[in-house]
């Protein structure tokens, strides 16, 4: 049934053809079950494990590697002689890399899929219904409830479907809807129609929503919708429909992979074509086919050389280390790639309650009447410090601390706050904080009494557990609470009937203490309290009181005000009828006004500074709240989202105002606005969509089930540590301390991580460029192989992987939070950088080939061949006069390969030092700023020595131990790369950065 909240109870009953007393007949139940289906949320159709595994191989680079592995496997199969074993090493290693990558990928995907399952925990197991086949109420499984069923709910029950309330069987019905609306205060329900068909969930005061909890009272209602049609069901559908986008880094790496694969394909084809003439060379035994296969192997080597196999592992490691650093700052990251996305966040949409504020109501102002002279009335106004439930703070008058006990009016005000109250404070020893027990508003009054300490109780010697209610218990010993007149909507107040305790010999009789909404309570006051006397309440005095309340309720503070009053001579207990709440109004008449307290959910202390940080970093903060607009704007001014006198017409909207705008203007509003009030969860998703249309990277916070679709849609969903499991599973990050400042710290960390990733991605790629140049040069010049695939894999994975990982520990730049967020479209490698890589890569390639050639041409223990013989080695046979007196086997000697590999590794270690900073000289940023990097370079070199000097490794890698003169040559060839990069950095600093 649509818009049940706007229909009268009679209309709802006749729509389903049911009577409130008897319920549906078995026949109707059967028909409704067929029409509407069972009352449950369908299970999520997840991807099977096999589908997830296949998905991991959709990446182009992965496919090229897979192809290379298959080809080298086939080639290894046809290999003859002693090389058979070593030939299988390479395809085996490539496959291992691919499998490891796939496992990590599948594990991450699996985590993301659990969000929808978590919604299940809000489904109630059972429900209580009236049906025509039984006289009394019967308990049935919640999934069997159908629209039209008459359902009974009582305190502690979980609501089994979306229900329109027909009648309330207690004084009040309070419902905790925080999982749906995110607002922590429980809501008082009624049975009248809500005429507005477009009302937001917070305003549907005559509806009970599936999955919410009954906090107090008992009621009977008619089921309006079940299953997927309920509010929580709609949330599930939104979540199921939300596809996760790739993070900016994933998109970058995908683009990069595509470009790389095109380049690789081109180079492979080029190498093949250049050498078609050599296919028949005698070295291949004159067989064209074997010649083709030989160059095929070189093409495979090229593919292996060009792909940075170590990159996925290094990125994962760097992100994982980043998540550990963030966890120390209370930000728990659930999906690794989002660590980097945080770095380009340009908009943070934050909930107000609990994130920007403490979610601990606290009284910050109060007043009592000072004196009344005819129509002139003066007030004593006080402010109270402390913004949490901790009983620590002082009472100030004109900014100077005062003793509250000196003012008779404050003693009575404290008495009302302590007695007209069902809540208390509790010190949680495990968390080390004071927490509320009961309603937030009432706990604020309990805390106020503790701060006022009107009877000067000795509290310094008490433990924190005893301190929690010390001053309240003193007051509760003086007066005994007999009974409570519950809050009701018509009078907007509640009261307690108290009698003096036997022990106190004060000459006071019974009293009634009242607290409630100011207009309601003050209308029933005939007197005001001045000191210990009471004075008649005249029109001008009432106007004065109401004007202060109005001033407090608007403007910068927007406090929630409560009036406190006493009935000095209440009726006798015996004369009062306590089971008829309609009579409560008469008992709360003839009151004496005592004072007013103003409270708010105060902003967290650190938030103002964090918002300033965001402003410096070019990040816009948008506050989104279910609260009303006045309160929202006031908090925005307090924390610096708006300045004190800023005009907010185009920058703050309610959900309704936003909906009423045409679509184009809604989109425009999202570009300007910094505050949305009275919003529904669906608005959050809409806002994210509009922001994404401007290419903004949005971080969205949320804690309720209602926030899950928006959390899933935003690039960075941020759930609260105290939030629901659904919100946490739909988000990328969880704030352990629910604090907005933690988000800003995480953004800073994200920026630092991205900068470091840029450095090591560039480092790894320049290494690959060098390897490609090396293989291309040997093939183009017709030289013997300088590097074989298994050596390339070793370099890409191990020797380069360690320094690359260590580059993830580079310290962040000092001005990292003074720059605007980087555009997600900014390429990883810009034009100048591309030139730099090409220059460095070109040097690396030339140096490795040069080192191998040096051994052939000039080394003391080398064959001293001529350059012509070296470039035409393919034609070497015993019968060829050009190669007279030369053993052709020499062209397959391991020494030149060892020289080439050692030069490659040494240059890479120098390059790692170059990568400490993008443009800073090594003189300005010496190597020891990153001690991890020095350690990893030592480790990499040790591993290189391992494969040179420890059997059987040299055989597998086809290497030979080097002597001292050869190592000297390696260093001479390698070290100039540092000078080359310093020169390029110098040009960048002085001529390119304007």
UniProtKB/Swiss-Prot annotation:
One of its GO terms (biological process) is apoptotic mitochondrial changes. It is found in: Endoplasmic reticulum membrane; Sarcoplasmic reticulum membrane. It holds the Pfam family Cation_ATPase_N. Disulfide bonds join 876-888. PROSITE patterns: ATPASE_E1_E2. Its cofactor is Mg(2+). GO terms for molecular function: ATP binding; ATP hydrolysis activity; calcium ion binding; P-type calcium transporter activity; protein homodimerization activity. InterPro entries: ATPase_P-typ_cation-transptr_C, ATPase_P-typ_cation-transptr_N, ATPase_P-typ_cyto_dom_N, ATPase_P-typ_P_site, ATPase_P-typ_TM_dom_sf, ATPase_P-typ_transduc_dom_A_sf, HAD-like_sf, HAD_sf. Its EC number is 7.2.2.10. Residues 70-89, 274-295, 778-787, 852-897, 950-964 are lumenal. One of its GO terms (cellular component) is membrane. It comes from the Eukaryota. Keywords: ATP-binding, Calcium, Calcium transport, Disulfide bond, Endoplasmic reticulum, Ion transport, Magnesium, Membrane, Metal-binding, Nucleotide-binding, Phosphoprotein, Sarcoplasmic reticulum, Translocase, Transmembrane, Transmembrane helix, Transport. The active site is at 351 (4-aspartylphosphate intermediate). Inhibited by sarcolipin (SLN) and myoregulin (MRLN). Has also been shown to be reversibly inhibited by phospholamban (PLN) at low calcium concentrations in vitro. Dephosphorylated PLN decreases the apparent affinity of the ATPase for calcium in vitro and this inhibition is regulated by the phosphorylation of PLN. Enhanced by DWORF; DWORF increases activity by displacing sarcolipin (SLN), phospholamban (PLN) and myoregulin (MRLN). Belongs to the cation transport ATPase (P-type) (TC 3.A.3) family. Type IIA subfamily. PANTHER family: CALCIUM-TRANSPORTING ATPASE. Interacts with sarcolipin (SLN). Interacts with phospholamban (PLN). Interacts with myoregulin (MRLN). Interacts with DWORF. Interacts with VMP1. This is Sarcoplasmic/endoplasmic reticulum calcium ATPase 1. It comes from Mus musculus. The gene is Atp2a1.
